[in-house]
């Protein structure tokens, strides 16, 4: 299609075919002027000879007379050259056609592929011109009384690029409307409207069809490269986000240190110019994976999985751990909205805050574990539990806002809640858990088990059914079951140890 379009578009730049209505002498003069003017492009003479070789049968095909477009209907500003005499060109009646069957007719149509150079392209373009004869014959044949050039009326066929080189300075304004009228349907049929629109002004300004062929190629190349670059960026961004979510799951399942997940999130948040909402989702997911990996390390070191739930709440609620350790409701209520406000516009800054506060929360949990039992009373436990419920509601609202992006998180937390539902009746039967410093998070876990069954109704509603959650679902389910068993065992061990310590402290 490119060869056809370039051939039709470049025909007038290289050749000004002119058939005159009066005898062979004037036609030979006009054809010599057309050939001399078309010799500005390097290979036009060779193409004229090749056109004689390859297409001597064109005059036979052109039995139909040319459809003539009146020059008044097309040209606006060349009022002096509007001789609206109508020339019908039929291939057998003129002496010029008999004298020069190949050379005279063919510059009208065939010498339009000079600038591309290679004869193979010429052959293909001339062959592609043969089925286009019906299109080309319907081009406007303007009969201009060109008194400045010859005393006879010269009929010139205007092609896509506009003016022929013979009278390019005079006739460019006439060539433009016709070329726009004709070039647009042809080039649209060939699928290159924008390249033709860009190529036209260039070729009219330069008088070269070469520039239009280059313009087409350049615009196509630019469009392809831009679309490829955008597509690559989008696919990379999507692949990164998916691989990041999968990487989170893997790091959580393996219990690797938080640094890997943190590196993934940071590089992705910096490398992706996608959106702040995605950044916020990343910070939430990152905080979750951090706290989970951290929680696993703590369960291995201390045998307690409650610190993991506390770590999640630390990273996402920012300031709740301190208030939990100290029992301050006001700072906690302030910390949560601040974190929510900061997390949206500044995911990077929120990430740093989450890391620092997570570290502070660890230190405080350790300090709280070392504290004697008498400091933590049942009232403080109730306050903390109420605060945790409030934080859970806020987090759920936030998640529902971005549920389309972080669609695997609610499923992950729902599965995380399932084993806790089985283990939480033991917490209710255990009277010492409220006051035990090591089991600070047990009342929160009870709050978790009370909250989470309401999650499926709220979280599954906004999720569209066609989201790519299905591959993550299997991974999350297997990982949730495995982690749930490990967490149950860890909590049992931690509780046993906590009871021992609590009994000693009580004594």
From Swiss-Prot:
Tissue occurrence: Germ-cells specific.
BP terms from Gene Ontology: DNA damage response; DNA integrity checkpoint signaling; homologous chromosome pairing at meiosis; homologous recombination; meiotic chromosome condensation; protein-DNA covalent cross-linking repair
Coiled coil: none
Keywords linked to the UniProt accession: Chromosome, Nucleus
Motif mapping: SUMO interaction motif 1 (SIM): 12-15, 66-69, 86-89, 108-111
Composition bias type Low complexity, residue spans: 1-51
A GO cellular component entry from the record: PML body
Gene disruption phenotype: Mutant male mice are sterile and spermatocytes exhibit DNA damage, crossover defects, and chromatin condensation abnormalities.
Feature: compositional bias, Basic and acidic residues: 122-141, 179-354, 431-449
Keyword Isomerase: no
Localization of this protein: Chromosome; Nucleus, PML body; Nucleus
Domain remarks in the Swiss-Prot or TrEMBL record: SUMO interaction motif 1 (SIM) mediates the binding to polysumoylated substrates.
Summary of subunit composition and partner proteins: Interacts (via SIM domains) with SUMO2; this interaction allows the GCNA recruitment to DPCs sites. Interacts with TOP2A; this interaction allows the resolution of topoisomerase II (TOP2A) DNA-protein cross-links.
Family assignment from sequence similarity: Belongs to the serine-aspartate repeat-containing protein (SDr) family.
Protein name (database record): Germ cell nuclear acidic protein
Organism name: Mus musculus (Mouse)
């Amino acid at each position: 299609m490119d060869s056809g379009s370039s051939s039709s578009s470049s025909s007038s730049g290289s050749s000004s075919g002119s058939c005159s209505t009066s005898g062979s002498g004037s036609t030979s003069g006009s054809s010599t002027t057309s050939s001399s003017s078309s010799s500005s492009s390097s290979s036009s003479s060779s193409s004229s000879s090749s056109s004689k070789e390859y297409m001597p049968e064109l005059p036979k095909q052109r039995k139909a007379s040319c459809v003539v477009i009146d020059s008044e209907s097309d040209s606006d500003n060349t009022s002096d050259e509007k001789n609206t005499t109508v020339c019908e060109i039929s291939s057998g009646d003129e002496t010029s056609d008999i004298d020069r069957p190949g050379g005279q007719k063919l510059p009208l149509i065939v010498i339009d592929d000079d600038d591309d150079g290679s004869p193979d392209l010429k052959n293909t373009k001339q062959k592609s011109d043969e089925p286009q004869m019906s299109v080309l014959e319907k081009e406007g044949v303007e009969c201009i009384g060109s008194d400045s050039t010859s005393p006879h009326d010269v009929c010139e066929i205007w092609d896509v690029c506009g003016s022929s080189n013979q009278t390019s300075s005079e006739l460019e304004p006439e060539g433009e409307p016709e070329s726009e009228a004709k070039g647009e349907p042809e080039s649209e049929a060939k699928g290159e409207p924008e390249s033709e629109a860009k190529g036209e002004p260039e070729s009219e300004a330069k008088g070269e069809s070469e520039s239009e062929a280059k313009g087409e190629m350049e615009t196509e190349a630019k469009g392809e490269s831009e679309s490829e670059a955008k597509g690559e960026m989008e696919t990379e961004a999507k692949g990164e986000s998916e691989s990041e979510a999968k990487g989170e799951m893997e790091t959580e399942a393996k219990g690797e240190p938080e640094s890997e997940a943190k590196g993934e999130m940071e590089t992705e948040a910096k490398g992706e110019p996608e959106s702040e909402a995605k950044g916020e989702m990343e910070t939430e997911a990152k905080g979750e994976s951090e706290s989970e990996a951290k929680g696993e390390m703590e369960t291995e070191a201390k045998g307690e999985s409650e610190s993991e739930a506390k770590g999640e709440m630390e990273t996402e609620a920012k300031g709740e751990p301190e208030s939990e350790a100290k029992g301050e409701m006001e700072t906690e209520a302030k910390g949560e909205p601040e974190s929510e406000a900061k997390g949206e516009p500044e995911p990077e800054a929120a990430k740093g805050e989450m890391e620092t506060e997570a570290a502070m929360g660890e230190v405080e949990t350790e300090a709280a574990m070392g504290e004697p039992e008498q400091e933590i009373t049942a009232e403080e436990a109730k306050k903390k539990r109420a605060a945790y419920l409030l934080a859970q509601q806020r987090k759920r609202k936030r998640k529902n806002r971005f549920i389309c992006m972080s669609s695997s998180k609610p499923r992950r937390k729902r599965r995380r809640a399932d084993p806790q539902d089985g283990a939480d009746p033991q917490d209710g039967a255990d009277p010492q858990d409220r006051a035990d410093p090591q089991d600070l998070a047990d009342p929160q876990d009870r709050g978790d088990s009370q909250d989470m069954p309401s999650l499926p109704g709220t979280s599954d509603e906004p999720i569209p059914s066609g989201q790519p959650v299905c591959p993550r679902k299997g991974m999350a389910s297997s990982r949730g079951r495995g982690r749930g068993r490990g967490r149950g065992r860890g909590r049992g061990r931690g509780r046993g140890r906590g009871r021992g310590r609590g009994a000693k402290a009580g004594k």
